[in-house]
Amino acid sequence: MKDTADITVLGAGSYGTALAISLASNGHKTLLWGHDPEHIATLSRERCNAAFLPGISFPDCLVMEADLGKALAASRNVLVVVPSHVFGDVLRQAKSLLRADARIVWATKGLEPETGRLLQDVARDALGDAFPLAVLSGPTFAKELAAGLPTAISVAGTDAGFTADLVELLHSPKRLRVYANDDFIGLQLGGAVKNVIAIGAGMSDGIGFGANARTALITRGLVELSRLGEALGAQQATFMGMAGLGDLVLTCTDNQSRNRRFGLALGKGCDVNTAQSEIGQVVEGYRNTKEVFTLAKRLGVEMPITEQIYAVLYQGKSPLDAAKELLAREKKSETAAAD
């Protein structure tokens, strides 16, 4: 089937729209699909996503499409940018509509709800093994990406040719640097765990602990990410790159991060429901915490920071008590195999 677009983006939220804008700004004809026809009609009419990215106009070669079948028929390259808790549902909905030569990449960050499985496993369950898969991950705030501010990300996949094509599609000398990576597992994991640690960093700052505590939490959070990655067969070098340290620092230190702002509200005394309402958008880290906690328990990986954040979100523990428990833990060597 002949392409009528270079790539189709599924998901018209802030990040999906930002990626679509970036792709179209490279001169690629890009189709942006969303599940709400009224929202897509508004985007098409106003030529911007005023709700999430106000003041940023769409390039001429960015086209809206409310019909999923038409969107998937337009291009073999499909970029999925939906929340992790609906990722599997969207792929199952898409399966019968995908072209035989389709190639699937996602920028969704998270794990499968309840089970803690990697999204590669969710994708294979939904689609089978016929399609090349890839993941896009790294330190990216949607507003900055959409505005064309310099950004760097990583991409990894099951097919080297697909990965190379994605680098060519996404890379822009003026706005976006894209690094190829061969660690498919590591890139998926980094995007989920950093959301959890960002909530913890926000809690710490909300309590008023300061920069020293925040930096310690980020550093030990990176240890937890590396430890979980090792158990899953990821490459440790990945966690020192864009999808590990890069994304972790970004989300833990800047208030553009919904996860960090959520943690800040909790640290200042808000309950979970109030804190989520204040954000006004999906806080991926809330679900990610349960998913990462579940995965770590299943694999027998010790992740004390994650455990305390889970206790705050799902067991009613106060952020201050969680912090006190972390500080009171038995003294250990920094370089010991388990902390």
UniProtKB/Swiss-Prot annotation:
It is found in: Cytoplasm. Its EC number is 1.1.1.94. The keyword Zinc-finger does not apply. Sn-glycerol 3-phosphate binds at residues 109, 138, 140, 194, 247, 257-259. NADPH binds at residues 14-15, 35, 109, 142, 258, 282, 284. One of its GO terms (cellular component) is cytosol. One of its GO terms (biological process) is glycerol-3-phosphate biosynthetic process. The keyword Magnesium does not apply. The active site is at 194 (proton acceptor). SUPFAM superfamilies: 6-phosphogluconate dehydrogenase C-terminal domain-like, NAD(P)-binding Rossmann-fold domains. It is an enzyme of class 1 (oxidoreductase). Disulfide bonds: none annotated. Pathway: Membrane lipid metabolism; glycerophospholipid metabolism. GO terms for molecular function: glycerol-3-phosphate dehydrogenase [NAD(P)+] activity; NAD binding. It catalyses: sn-glycerol 3-phosphate + NAD(+) = dihydroxyacetone phosphate + NADH + H(+); sn-glycerol 3-phosphate + NADP(+) = dihydroxyacetone phosphate + NADPH + H(+). Catalyzes the reduction of the glycolytic intermediate dihydroxyacetone phosphate (DHAP) to sn-glycerol 3-phosphate (G3P), the key precursor for phospholipid synthesis. Belongs to the NAD-dependent glycerol-3-phosphate dehydrogenase family. This is Glycerol-3-phosphate dehydrogenase [NAD(P)+]. It comes from Shewanella amazonensis (strain ATCC BAA-1098 / SB2B). The gene is gpsA.
